Amino acid sequence: MNQPWRTHLQTKLQQLHEQGQYRNLHVTEQAEETWLIRDEKRMLNLASNNYLGLSGDERLKEAAIASTRKYGAGATASRLVVGNYSLYEEVERSICDWKGTEKALVVSSGYTANVGVISSLACRHDIVFSDKLNHASIVDGIILSGAEHKRYRHNDLNHLEALLKTASPEKRKLIVTDTVFSMDGDTAYLRELVQLKEKYGAIIIVDEAHASGIYGIGGAGLSHIEKDLAQKIDIHMGTFSKALGCYGAYLTGDAIYIEYLQNMMRSFIFTTALPPSTLGAVQKAIEIVQEDHKRRENLIANGEYFRSKLREAGFNIGNSSTHIVPIVVGSNENTLRFSKRLQEAGIAAIAIRPPTVPVHSSRIRFAVTSEHTIADLKWAIERITHIAKEEELFV
């Protein structure tokens, strides 16, 4: 191997080890709906994004198999070549009906959706206003666009308005936010953000990755909780890989936006289409989440229970108000030690460290699902609290 490159890579890896930021891949096997086998140990799964337990649903499996038998294992090309099967149009129609929008575009992942939509719409003549805790894919999309990047303090509407006021009137303005923040479990103030975008002549993109399938009418997303709010949002992004239990993502809004992205979004144009099996499962999942209110109700109730009990025990869970519940520890070292002890006790609890979260805010990110029982959560909370006391970390 080229020696200068070897030296450079070895130095960087050593730095990651020293900083407690080195990452390993661990083999995981699904044992039951809420339990898994990780490194040959059975654990309660409190780390998954399978929020509604749909990944293992027999109806999705059957839909995936049927689509594979009809169309084959792979799409064989990009959508703009010969990979645009009728399944795509069926799913996109379902998304529009679900979200109340004019047109939709199914893409390969949430990451490529955010990187693609922002870098396609914005350029060096524009300004993008982004919440400081937005997902990395949003940040990467802004960097790739070359636009002026204005980060406002997390959920600080006064700071955002101050930035909007001082922005050049000649520049186009784009506001972008997560709706449910993936590492903190709190939510954006969508009504107020829409008011600001209208006041200052901006457009707004919302990332519903962790809200699609859960919140709002028929699980259409957090933007659908308040009447008429969704129609004031320019572009909605959501994923199929979390509550819907599948893979892929969507962008939806007014037809002109989607038509533009179809022609200009490089992460859409230059990639092979999703396999038919995925689309078949996605179509079934969209149908299920709109009808199965019980799953969504269970998830919300489980989140409320888990948050309340951790707060009662004295843990710092920030402003979490959803099914995503962090325990903020602080240092990488303490977080890794806590994670290791929890896994030894049979809880899949993964340490989240910089650059995923800000420096000095390393945490254990818990995610409850609709399939957890109160007994599961009570069992976990007892062990979490006991270990934290032993380690003298929180309680």
Curated annotation (Swiss-Prot):
Positions of disulphide bridges: none
Associated pathway: Cofactor biosynthesis; biotin biosynthesis
InterPro entries assigned: Aminotrans_II_pyridoxalP_BS, Aminotransferase_I/II_large, AON_synthase_class-II, AONS_Archaea/Proteobacteria, PyrdxlP-dep_Trfase, PyrdxlP-dep_Trfase_major, PyrdxlP-dep_Trfase_small
Domain of life, source organism: Bacteria
EC number: 2.3.1.47
UniProt GO molecular function: 8-amino-7-oxononanoate synthase activity; pyridoxal phosphate binding
Binding-site residues for substrate, renumbered to this chain: R23, H135, T356
Quaternary state and interactors: Homodimer.
Name of protein: Putative 8-amino-7-oxononanoate synthase
